[in-house]
Amino acid sequence: MRADNKTIIIGRVLLFLLCLAPLQLLLWDAVQQQLGANPVEALLHRSGEWALRLLLATLAVTPLRRVTGWGWLLRFRRMLGLYAFFYALFHFVVYLWLDRGLSWGEIGVDLLQRPYISIGFAALLILLALAATSTKGVMRRLGRRWTALHQWVYAAGLFSVIHYLWLVKSDYREPGLYAAIFLLLMLFRMGQVKRRLQHRFRVYFNAPQNMTFPESRSRISE
């Protein structure tokens, strides 16, 4: 299946609005005082979850493209990755400003003594580096080093999942689900399930077996 430029533009606009919707709902709930008894915790939880969801969606683009043969999916990956960074940054700002009141002493102690905060901060730094180098101009300047740098998105995904698992104290169902999705994406990347899913999809949709699309080099950008 191919998509023309007009369809891609419309898709990007829709994706932009969809990715922005969680923030709008979050701010609306904050204004309406509907964040519950602990609004700061609610802001942290919801922003962090959306950062992880969008990061996993970014990682899922390449497997979906390989299974379906829909090369146009790659055109949306950079936006997903940048939104993942945006929500991760929002999550961190809420922690710095509302949770810790910009008390750098407390923040330093947290980074040293709370491993889940340290690993979450590491994930944010990786996403920051990827977002800062996501433009085509930087891609051309860095060359092969750019490709190697953007492979770190998988480490960011792993650190984010561990951050969530480490944070939860009792109910592991939701972070466990995200961990399972990440594991499946990594298994696909290693080629253990790619061929079977690809064959089933193409047989079902009667797609040609030799259909190939050029591979993009980035996980957070086109």
Walk through the language-model features, giving the residues of each:
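Membrane-embedded alpha-helical bundles that constitute the cytochrome b-like, heme-associated redox core
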Residues: 1-222
